[in-house]
Swiss-Prot record:
<comment type="similarity">
    <text>Belongs to the PDCD5 family.</text>
</comment>
<protein>
    <recommendedName>
        <fullName>DNA-binding protein LS215_1892</fullName>
    </recommendedName>
</protein>
<dbReference type="InterPro" id="IPR002836">
    <property type="entry name" value="PDCD5-like"/>
</dbReference>
<dbReference type="InterPro" id="IPR036883">
    <property type="entry name" value="PDCD5-like_sf"/>
</dbReference>
<dbReference type="InterPro" id="IPR022889">
    <property type="entry name" value="DNA_bind_arc"/>
</dbReference>
<dbReference type="GO" id="GO:0003677">
    <property type="term" value="F:DNA binding"/>
</dbReference>
<keyword id="KW-0238">DNA-binding</keyword>
<dbReference type="Pfam" id="PF01984">
    <property type="entry name" value="dsDNA_bind"/>
</dbReference>
<dbReference type="GO" id="GO:0005829">
    <property type="term" value="C:cytosol"/>
</dbReference>
């Protein structure tokens, strides 16, 4: 036995359809915005990195995507502020990576506390 659909149910269904359509549109706009920003970033990186340095960054991105994203943003900021010579060569990128690695090693401290047996 099926219950008759009331006007309120139809109204609710329409409201849910509209909400779903709005959410889908918002997600699509966000996806387009992210794609556009990524395209702009790639364009900037093509200018500030030599092909070899770009390849190294691509390799890093495959292994550590979050680190690569952070590194890309830092490189772009350094280049735009004029604090680094452009284009960045592979050797210069290696030096930057070594500096970051040293800094991370200094930040990483292991504390060992001895506890007595009781």
């Amino acid at each position: 036995m099926s219950a008759p659909t009331s006007y309120d149910d139809e109204e609710l269904e329409e409201l849910l359809r509209r909400k779903a359509a709005q959410e889908q549109k918002r997600l699509e706009e966000e996806r387009k915005r992210k794609a556009e920003l990524e395209s702009q970033k790639e364009s900037i990186l093509r200018v500030i990195l030599t092909p070899e340095a770009r390849q190294r960054l691509t390799n890093i991105k495959l292994v550590k995507p979050e680190f690569a994203e952070s590194l890309e943003n830092q490189l772009i900021a350094l280049a735009q502020s004029g604090r680094i010579k452009v284009p960045i060569t592979d050797e210069e990128l290696k030096q930057i990576l070594e500096q970051i690695s040293e800094q991370n090693r200094r930040d990483f401290k292991i504390q060992i506390r001895e506890r007595g047996w009781k």
